[in-house]
Amino acid sequence: MKNINFNNTQSYQDLKNHFRKIKNIHLRDLFASDLNRFKKFSIIFENEMLIDFSKNRITDETLIYLLNLAKETDVKSGIKLMFSGAKINKTENRSVLHIALRNRTNRPIILNNCNIMLEVNALLEKMKNFSKMVIHGEWKGYTGKSISNVVNIGIGGSDLGPYMVTEALRPYKNHLNMYYVSNIDGTHLTEVLKKINPENTIFLIASKTFTTDETITNAHSAKKWFLHYSQDQSTLDKHFFALSANIKNALNFGININNIFKFWDWVGGRFSLWSSAGLSIMLSIGFDNFEKFLDGAHAMDNHFYHTNYKENIPILLALISIWYTNFFGSETEAIFPYDQYMHRFSAYFQQSNMESNGKSINRNGQRINYQTGPIIWGEPGTNGQHAFYQLIHQGTRLIPCDFIAPVFSHNDLNNHHMKLISNFFAQTQALAFGQSRDSILHRLILSKKNQDDIKRILPFKICKGNQPTNSILIRKITPYNLGALIALYEHKIFVQGYILNIFSFDQWGVELGKELSQNIYNYLNINIKNKSYDASTEGLINFYKSFMI
């Protein structure tokens, strides 16, 4: 890996100089001066997905400098390292091989002198056989009833990803009721337990380490609830399953060895939906649709690996993101799926991006003096239009946005989808081109308002525009297309981290809070005080404890 700070490259200096020239150019002028702009700055993926990046504040020259940055930092070598199984997660000494889980060509991937595809295929076969038994009613609960409810207990990647995909592919869902429990707040589990019957429910305990406090606490409570009804430890074999790399801990919990679906340390948690952690997805949509989901991701993997810099969608989107965070000074990026089934998509990539690239130390162990990962947020359209779009249109911040929409809806109710897609098109147009003073003045004059009213209201109606967007139009949200879309964003995040000279596959910042939490829990629970707390924390603890007397 080339461990160079990107702001020490010639490309960075070129971009810095170039930015001074174009920072005030308006998108109106960029489109007016180039009638082929859309054609030049858009790519179609497999005739299923259009990526339009023409409404970005870039020129042909910008793109040349950005692509030079990718070449100078040797992104293609980084891609090859990841796909080959090199241990690019240096701080944990691990390979990063979620791409192996969707390697549909069965190309051998050698790790520690073993072809890991043999294990991957064996796991997929085990998941397939189990899911078919559950879906077809052949897997019985302890009283002989077929399974109707599936409860996935996990957090982070073991929850956000599977939950997002299950919701996004709800049109492909079978009869099984899917529930997801993540929060250690007892309310989350309690509300799910109210809805289910222990006789026809299975629990999937999704934890790579099988030590995650939130997950194991919820799992123990679910187990206690279940045994209250079954009154027999052996009945756990019919109802509890582990999706984990830690076989020993799963066995100690009481999970039957045959009920453990393996995980590997080369699969990062936030990429785990492709692994056994995706069992809830398979149970929801069936094995055939899950295979199509993997196929779509694999197709994007091939595009990412084989396509040149200039036409490589993840590379282009990553470069454009870096352009805004490090030259325009934008702090956030928004993702707006115009599809209600995709309502958890933004939240999933909030975790995936911010946990991956929320770093301030470079790969050489030195503090960074430039911006790394942006803050990711978003909601489905059109809800967001009536909540926060106002700030994007007329606020003081530059917020690059991704708009995602299907051409065909799964629920084309009357003319609902045409109205939805009209909003999609209108918002990207309004953000790019705005509404100038002259056009507003003309409309106000035509409305026959008096001069005083026009003068008073005119400044407030101006929308400056020049807000950048990417538009991603997908023929339909199918398992295949969703798989490709998720892989696109995953690879975009990888490229960003690689260029920014950070390790994208660890999350040490998450660990500190866990450690402190355990110390405080010991103090609250058994009055063991391991250390002195700051005045604020001490005051908060004392206030809490005053109610426990």
From Swiss-Prot:
Q: Name one GO cellular component term.
A: cytosol
Q: In which pathway does it act?
A: Carbohydrate biosynthesis; gluconeogenesis; Carbohydrate degradation; glycolysis; D-glyceraldehyde 3-phosphate and glycerone phosphate from D-glucose: step 2/4
Which PROSITE patterns does this chain map to? P_GLUCOSE_ISOMERASE_1, P_GLUCOSE_ISOMERASE_2, P_GLUCOSE_ISOMERASE_3
Keyword Isomerase tagged? yes
Instruction: Spell out the molecular function terms from Gene Ontology.
Output: carbohydrate derivative binding; glucose-6-phosphate isomerase activity; monosaccharide binding
Catalytic site residues?
355 (proton donor), 386, 514
Alphabetically sorted, this entry's keywords are: Cytoplasm, Gluconeogenesis, Glycolysis, Isomerase
The reaction(s) catalysed by this protein are: alpha-D-glucose 6-phosphate = beta-D-fructose 6-phosphate
Biological process according to GO: gluconeogenesis; glucose 6-phosphate metabolic process; glycolytic process
Kind of enzyme, top EC level? Answer: isomerase
Q: Where in the cell is it found?
A: Cytoplasm
Q: What is its EC number?
A: 5.3.1.9
Q: Does the keyword Chloroplast apply?
A: no
Q: What does this protein do?
A: Catalyzes the reversible isomerization of glucose-6-phosphate to fructose-6-phosphate.
| Family indicated by similarity | Belongs to the GPI family.
Specify the protein name: Glucose-6-phosphate isomerase
